[in-house]
Amino acid sequence: GMLRYAALTGDTTLIPRVEKRWKLYKEYGMTENYENYNWFERYDTWTEPCAIVDSYLLATQLWAATRNPTYLEDADKIYLNVIAATQRHNGGFGCDKPVGVVYPELGIHADEAYWCCTMRGGEGLGRAAEYAYFTEGNRIVVPFYRESRLQLPDRNVVLEQRTDYPFGDRIEFRFAEKPDKEVSLALVVPSYMQLRSLTLNGHPVEANVSAGFAEVAGPFSAGDRIELEYGFAARWVPLENRDIADRTLYKAMY
């Protein structure tokens, strides 16, 4: 609500208040696999895709408001580890046991909450598609990697993206048409991603990463291909909930 009010009124003094609440949520309300505890300090309950989707929306919108790449990484982890995992075999969404303070491993609490979570899960998937691209003037920002096709008729941009992210090791963009205006691509590079190479039509592009993005400048022609090769390294990460007293515990991330 505060972010929406700030966007409508231009009152940016509200944004730090949202950031403070997000920090509180991450420290006490988020599970170790980026789901949610259904109540603060009630760690033996269950997770809720409704709240999970809200956290994904909020993290993305906080990034859009502040351009702090940490929020974008939060959103990426929520989508890949949670939204993509709480969707059940029939397409609906259900509740899990919250991993962290009480439960050491992931398990299903309710297979599907069709009267509630499935609806919000659908909204989350719709927003994931909406958030696949942002534009800033003639700059096309790619904050998440999705198999997709972007069309901007006002500048004759038709951009196709091919990827198995986070699986595989390549992301390919292809301009199907020559843009009417010179555009640039800003490709997200999370801190946990190893950027191995960036090429334009097979030729290396200098990959200077700033604020979590690598920039590829135009002009582009029909058929131009931008390819990003990446990898991940397995690592141990300290547990994040502040009510976990044992600081010798870690979780494996990849």
Where do the protein language model's features map onto the residues?
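Glycan-recognition and catalytic cores of secretory/periplasmic carbohydrate-active enzymes
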Residues: 1-254
